Amino acid sequence: MKYVLNADQMKASDSRMIQQIGIPSLVLMERAAQQCVEMIKQEMPDAHTALVVCGSGNNGGDGFAVARILYEEGVFVETAFVGKPESRSHETETQMKILQKIGVPIVTELPEKEYDVIIDAVFGIGLCRRIEGRYANVIERMNQYQGYKVAVDIASGISADTGAILGCAFRADLTVTFAYAKAGQLYHPGADYTGKLTVRPIGIWNPELEQSSDVYYHFEQGDLKTYMPKRRPDSNKGTYGKVLVIAGSKGMSGAAYLAAKAAYVTGAGLVRIYTDESNRQILQQLLPEAVLTTYQSEAEEPFGELQSLLDWADVVCMGSGIGRSQISEKLVKLVWKQNE
C-alpha cells in the first residue's frame, strides 16, 4: 500500500523530521539528491552530460546537490540557476556555494547545446501560482531539449494537490519523488507530465498521518492478498460464501462473466449467475464452474425463480450490463422489493 499526500501533508511530514526528530534539512537534501542520481544512473547508465536547472527554493537545493554528485561520478555537468538570488533558501545557497567551490559552472541562461539528461529542479510541491513570463520561457526551453528528462520530486508546473497544470509544466520522462507519492502526480493531467514515477525513501515518515482518515492511499497487488480469505483444510466451497450475480442483458454476457469471475478470484465459494437466456451458451463456455440460471425477457413472468435465488445467496451483486430497458427496471425493482 502506498500513501498519497497533498502539498500541506508533505510539508508537515518534512517539518516533523526537521523540527521534532532533529534531522537537518541539508541531510534530507543530500539523501534526496543521492536517490535521484541512483535512479538517473539506473535509467541512463550511458549518460555522459547533464544539465540541471534549479530554482530558489529547496527543490533547487536538491538540484544543486544532484549536480555535485553527478560531477563526482564523472558526468559532465552544467547547472543553470533561474531563480531569484534574494529568494534563495539557506540550504539552496549552501549547495550553490559547495558546487562553485568544486568548479561546476553555474549559469543564469539555458545553454543552446544538447545534453544526455535534463534535470528539472525549478519548482517543488509548494507551487500554487500560474507560471508566466521568464519562468514559462524557461520551462518551454527545457521541454525543447532532446535529452532524457528527469524531475526532482515533482515536475515544475504541476499542482501537487490536484494535478492541474499551472500555466505550463516540465514534461518529464522520469520523476523521482521522495517519501510519498503526491496526489497531483497521479491525477491527470499532471500524471501525463510526470512520466515514470518512482518513490524513494529519504528518511521521512509520518506514522500519525498514515493512520489518519485524511490521507489517501492506493493498493498494490500484494496488498490485496491480505483481504483474501484463508482456506482451512477441513473446509469446502460452501464454507466461503454464496454470491448471486444478477448481470448481463441481451448481448452483455461479458459483464456477467467479469463480475462472476471477480467473485471467484476474490475468494467466493459458490457463484450463481442470473442472466438473460441469450447469454447461456457463452457463459457456460467461459465459466463452467459457475451455476447458471436464466430468464426469458419476453416471458410474461420472467423472474419466477428470483426469490429462491435471493434466499440462497449470502451476497447479491447486481447491475453489471443489465442496461436501462423496461425488463431491467422491473428486475431491479423486484430485487429491491424482495429484500426490503
Language-model segments: residues:
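Short, hinge-like loop/turn segments at secondary-structure boundaries
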Residues: 95-98, 166-170, 193-194, 288-293
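A short, aliphatic-rich alpha-helical micro-motif
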Residues: 112-116, 169, 310-311, 336
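Internal gly/pro-rich beta-alpha loop/helix module
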Residues: 115-117, 122-214
